[in-house]
Amino acid sequence: MILGASLKIIAPTGQYDPTKLINWGINRWAFKPEFGYSQRWGYWVLDGYAGVWFYTTNNAFFDIPVPKPQTEAPVGSFEGHLSRDFKRNRLWVSLDGNFWVGGITSLNGIRNLESKQTSSRIGGTFSVPVSKHQSLKFSYSNGTYIRFGGNYQTVSAAWQYSWLGRPK
């Protein structure tokens, strides 16, 4: 069994124009403390993560004609993976799922209950080794329950390099 913790921080970077509703950048900080659990049973591995996104106030959200401070309530996130490891050749596959809830926004102190995010996705991942420290990873996911946004399918391919050795 492995227990872990992490803290993800997103700084207000990129180009932000308060006169536009949609921007390339963000005008607030975001923090996500997260706790994780991993347990192996032979060739099977179960991973689970729970975290909460916290956001600072955007004091210049779409400020036409005057600046409007926007706040967002925390967003809880849960993620899980059930993986099958093929040790002989370091190949693995997994069933992946996640769930988010929260994020009600307020503009000028007025809460918008319609902005609450509640969504989940399910998918799979396949990883094949290329060399001792490199692998190719392919994944697919689909929205399973979408209340607000996020109703899309994803397909991804990634090259992964690991500087660490394989756990025993």
List PLM regions with ranges.
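Outer-membrane pore/translocation modules
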Residues: 1-71, 114
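Outer membrane beta-barrel transmembrane domains
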Residues: 65-168
